[in-house]
Amino acid sequence: MPMRRRVLAAGVAGLFGAFATGRTAQAVENTENAEAAVPPVRLDLLNLVNLSHVNDPATTNVFPGDPAFTLETIATIPENGYYLQFVREGEHTGTHWGAPGHFNTGQPLADEMDPADLFLPAVKIDIRAKAARNADYAVTIDDLKAWERKHGRIPNDSMVILWTGWDAKWGTPAFPNLDADNRIHQPGFSIPAVKWLIDTGRLGRRGGTGTDTFSPDVGTDETYTVSQLVYQRHRISLEILANLRALPTTGAWVLAGGPIHRHGSGSTATIFGVLPPGVRA
């Protein structure tokens, strides 16, 4: 194997190895010694799982006030020799990620983010039972500590993902769960829980929150305080995630992609869970 490919393979192995042993990716700092520190990993053995919904004008749930999602066929193979659709959507339509400038003036926007900001170790916190009993449930510090007693400490700079069960409601009125006053009822993080994640470094310069709902905020909280806290430095939020059953509780990474617009607030996205060999949901 050429040296460049060996170092790449060793570096990727170091990332996964560091996470699996409770160390952050920053622990593997010396790329010249990475190959000696960890064995190479075959990239073709990584397993990818899709965490994105398919957008369809007939079913895509849109946050109240956001532009409607539309598709228009503007070229066909019989008439034009190729097939093409015109897409109209907001930057946060369907599965997407948000940049810090989405909620905080002066913080990085989508075209100012680093590639590493979009590739993060992930933990999944299953709150489906609590969310089923209370659609406005807010995850507490005690919830996070209880999760850690069972699964180990959340690594620094992680993507902390809530599995609320709302991914199964996608495409139906039960997803926004609006009341008579047009208020959203969806679970999320409490403000103290997010402050604790930040104060303890679990959300650091990088990292963020993920959810299968519209937002990390509880739907009834129109102050967006949780989002304002998360969206700082180079932290992001992954929202309207799909297929979270296929994402392991620990041991996986998430990779977010999508078009980058000038001064973008984020991007519609194809988001993958990246599972190293031996890691299963």
Question: Would you name each region that the model predicts?
Answer:
Residues 2-3, 9-22, 28-281:
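Active-/binding-site microenvironments in catalytic and ligand-binding cores
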